[in-house]
Structure formats: structure tokens, C-alpha cells
Amino acid sequence: RNFDPDGDHLYDAYCCIWASDALYYNGGAVTHSSAYNYRGNRLAARIAQLIGEDDTKYRFEAESILKAMNERLWMDDRGHWAEYQDLMGLKRLHKSAALWTIYTPIDCGASSPEQAYRATKYVDRDIPHIPIVVNKVDTIGYTISTTDWMPYAWSTNNVAHEEVANMALAYFQSGRNNEGFHLLKSDLTDEMLLGKSPGNFGQISHYDRERNEAYRDFGDN
């Protein structure tokens, strides 16, 4: 299933991202992994063209992935992609998407301008926002968690700097420059000014209730 044996052009996710520690999609059709494969096939098609090889199979797969994502994973009534679609049973959609389900399709070019804009509005509306407070008084911005999933489990609900920064990039890529700048500035202030090691950039924010400032100089960053 990781390599699409059923030929539906949507992919399971296994060790695709840092958060994969506790993500289990059980063979389902996953948004972020499908978006990565879309970008990979587009790049392979471009390389094939440059070296004079046939790009047909790569271009076809990229086009098919995008079509399947739009038909099965994009929820137009909600304005964002589903986290994934179950493989078995009722083939239900997991409708409470994580940050990586929003910023990855945007970064991979697997979204229209309208989809990108609407998906970032989902983050505004449904992803928890945590005020960044200085001197216990002044709120200077906000950071965000990766999901609203409960109960807490490592890698499925964190306040992680690389995730916040990726989401800030998605705001910029969606044309929402003010929101992107505000979130990025807030994240850098949270870690590089207010953190325990000023000027450093770790993985987890001290606003992460369970882990606090874990994994200083973590390679995933």
C-alpha cells in the first residue's frame, strides 16, 4: 500500500514525516504522503524531459494523484483536505486534519489558489492557538499546536517549531503574507528569545505541556 498496489493513486503514510512515530493510517489514503508523491512524480517528469527520456508515466501518475486527492480527500464543504480515508469498512474520512495535512499539499503544489486559501482558514478556525506571553503580562503573538486530537500522545499533538514554521510558510505561499509573518515572528520569538537557550532553535516549544523544550538542536529542524 505504501507504493499504491491497488492503483488508486493515493498513498498510505509510513515514516513520511517526523510525526510518523505515532501516526497509523492502516493502509488508508493519506493526504500528506499523496502530496509528496505528487511532487516527486512532477519532479521525475521534469528530469526525464531534461535528459531526453519519456516523461509520460511520471506525468500521468502526478495528474492521477492530484485528481484522486481532489475527488476523495478534498472536503469542499469544509474547505480543507481530510487527514486520510479509511481503507476498510465504511471508508470514512478523518475530517480533523493536522497541520502537515494543510501545509504539505500547499508546499508541494497540489492545491489551487482557492484551496490553499481556504485550507489556511481552517487552521485559523480549528487549530488551537496559544498566546505567547512575555513577563506574564504582555501577549506578543501566538503559536499553534499540530492538531486538536485527544488524548495527548507524542507526535500527534505537539507545539513543534518546525511545524509552526512550515505553517507560516504555507500562509506566505497562499498569499496571506500578514498571517505568515505574524506566525513566523511569534515562533522565532517563542524559541529564540524566550526559550531556555536564546538564539538556539530547538524542536519543541515550552508551550508543549507534556514535553516542554525537548530535543535541543534536533536534526528534524
Show where each model-derived region lies.
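Catalytic cores of carbohydrate-active enzymes
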Residues: D4-A19, N26-H32, Y36-D124, H129-V137, ...
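N-terminal alpha-helical segment
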Residues: N37, E163-V164
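Generic recognition of flexible, low-complexity loop/linker segments
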Residues: K91-H94, A153-N157, M167-L169
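Alpha-helical support elements that line or immediately flank enzyme active sites
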Residues: W100-P113, V164-G180, L184-D187
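Generic long, charged, amphipathic alpha-helical segments
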Residues: N135-A160
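Catalytic cores of secreted or luminal carbohydrate-active enzymes
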Residues: L184, F218-N221
